[in-house]
Structure formats: C-alpha cells, structure tokens
Amino acid sequence: MNKKQGRAFEAFVESEDNNLLRLAVLMTSNYQLAEDAVQRTLERLAARWDRVEHPKAFCRKVLTNLVIDDARAAARRPREEPLSPTHENPDPLAQDGLRSVELRPAVLSALDSLTPHQRAIVVLRYFGDHSDAEVSQALGVAVGTVKSTASRALAQLRTHPSLAGLFCPADYPAR
C-alpha cells in the first residue's frame, strides 16, 4: 500500500469504524467480541485495499461472516463464565435508536434468541438500515431468503418475553 492508499484507508477507517463497531455489538451482544471482529475485518480490508472496489460492502460481508462463524464456533465450545469488566467501554449504541437504557437490554436479549444468520439479517436490515439487496449481497443469499428470514425473525421477536408490551397484537395478527 503506497502513501496515498494508506491515507485513503485511514480516512475510511476513521469514517466507518464506529458504524462497524455498532453493527458488531448488535450482532454479538459483547463489546470485546465486537471489537475483535471489527479489527479482523479491517485487517482483511487492509490486505486487499488496492483491489476492493466497494469497501463498505466488503466490510459488511466480512464482518457478518466473521460474527456468524464465531457464533457457530462458540456454540461448539463449552460455556465459560464471563469475567467482570475492569473498565467502562465506550457505548457504540448511543448513536442510534437504542439510547433508552431500559430498552437496550430487552432488545439485546431478544436478539440473542435469534440464530446467528437471523440476527445478522435483522441487524443489517433494521439497525444498519441496509436494503434487502445489500443484505443479500453481504450474506451471499437470495433477496427472497433475506425477506423470508427477516419475516420469521421479526415474528419471533414480537413474541419474545423481554419485548412484551412493545407490540400491539392487533397490528400483527397470527397467521
């Protein structure tokens, strides 16, 4: 990477790292795992910077794949008790609609109930504000798969106990 490319890469990281971290935190519910996934994503981007035409799309795809792969690997390992945090982490969720301190744990708990694939689609589509086509491209699946998976995931979220009372049953009739 030459100096000009290096400056362009640094500018990209400066403008996008918070967005990537916010998506990763929503996908993982864990700040440290999210930081790690973003770091690995940016490492992969740096290695291919001169060949990547659409760095935002590349990062979305790599980040999502890393988070899904990590979740699958974690599901195969025995669970460990998390260590208590020794320092406060900055809040990457403070810049979006999850500002409500009371609502944030409920939303993260509900997202935890989804499969990694469902969660990635919901986070990219509704929290990342990407179109079905962009999510489809990021995950390498058909647009119809994104729509049907999002529909099933949202139906599951509507019935999640931590979100009880946030949805009006009359607005979402049973099928």
List the predicted regions and their residue ranges.
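Short amphipathic alpha-helical boundary/capping segments
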Residues: 9-11, 106-114, 157
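DNA-recognition helix of helix-turn-helix
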Residues: 54, 64, 68, 139-164
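A short, charge-rich alpha-helical start-of-domain segment used by transcription regulators
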Residues: 1-22, 32-35, 50
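Structural recognition of an alpha-helix C-terminal capping motif at a helix-to-coil junction
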Residues: 36-43, 53-65, 148
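A short pre-motif secondary-structure segment
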Residues: 121-125
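Arg/Lys-rich amphipathic alpha helix in sigma70-family domain 2
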Residues: 64-83, 99-100
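C-terminal flanking helix
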Residues: 17, 21, 42, 115, ...
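C-terminal edge and immediately downstream basic/flexible tail or linker adjoining helix-turn-helix-like DNA-binding
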Residues: 2-3, 7-8, 154-175
